[in-house]
Amino acid sequence: VVPFILALGVGLSSVLGGKISHDDSFGLMALCLIGPIAAVLIIGMFYDSSSADYGMNMIAEVSNGRELLFLYKKGFPLYFKDVAIALSPIVIFFMIFQFASLKLSKQQLIKIGIGILYTYIGLVLFLTGVNVGFMPAGNYIGEAIGNLPYSWILIPLGAIMGSLVVIAEPTVHILNNQVEEITGGAISKRVMMVSLSIGVGASLGLSMIRVIYGISIWYVLLPGYGLALLLTFFVPKIFSAIAFDSGTVASGPMSATFLLPFTMGACDALGGNILTDAFGVVALVTMTPLITVQVMGIIYKIKLRETEEEEEVALEMAS
């Protein structure tokens, strides 16, 4: 989803053109969040959550390699089908546009076909690995750390883990490459990665505080998003758009499949309410990059102004 929508946004802005087309290349991913959030909140209006409960995923007992292979063999057919259903609408729409207007060459079609095949195989392998072992492992690690006599250790460990996990997030690297390319290197991949690591690390630290002390998510989300929206008035437009895309991208597959189960395991070990204290970690992961990337934008704006002033002084002295 992320590579497709990012490419779609860049393509549309380049076709429409204009002096500020690079400013409009980002932000589409953030807009895609509105629909799912609204849909789930509407469902919540008609759903009685008083009797809701959550059952922890247990790691399957495996005594040898044959049993491990059996677990993966059991999961493969299901995800082969699911991924095929998920990708088929995109392929169908592409074929319609190909026959109607695109008229791409045979070489380009082969290149796109190989890309779709790689995507299909990669998603099948990823989903199988995640559901067979990765998510239960996240639960187990969180529960093991939560059972330690000093629960406060969850806060720094969570922050460190969040900072490292975002580096392994594949969609983050795609966004960083797009940002560096569109801005002509003015915003480098390294700077983007540092700001995202700080943001996601802070979000996991806040999530662990919520788990330990049972703090309502609204006490974090409302001031956090309020600050993020306030910063949009003081940073260049492109930084605001990148920030909102960064938040969406940072809360990708690694966050949903490891950080969320990790938080659930820690919450269960501490005897908290998983549905109210653990869920919401992905929302915090989405929120914090909005702040860190825009703070980076303010720093960039200040440095740019200082550079311009130095150049003006140098020109005056030269004249």
Predicted regions and their residues:
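Helix-loop-helix junctions within the multi-pass membrane cores of secondary transporters/permeases
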Residues: P3-A30, I34, A38, S151-T232
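Short helix-coil transition sites and intra-membrane helix breaks within transmembrane domains
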Residues: V1-V2, I85-A86, F126-M135, G162-H173, ...
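Transmembrane helix-loop junctions at the membrane interface of multipass transporters and ion channels
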Residues: V10-K19, I43-S51, M208-R210, F262-T276
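Hydrophobic membrane-spanning alpha-helices of multi-pass integral membrane proteins
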Residues: L31-P36, G122, I198-S203, S251-M264, ...
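Transmembrane helix-loop boundary segments of multi-pass membrane transporters
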Residues: V1, L78-K81, I110, G129, ...
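Hydrophobic alpha-helical transmembrane segments of multi-pass membrane proteins
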Residues: V1, F80-L87, G113-I116, Y120, ...
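Signature of multi-pass transmembrane helix bundles
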Residues: V1, G18-L148, W152, L275-V285, ...
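C-terminal membrane-solvent junction of multi-pass transporters and transport-like membrane proteins
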Residues: T232-P261
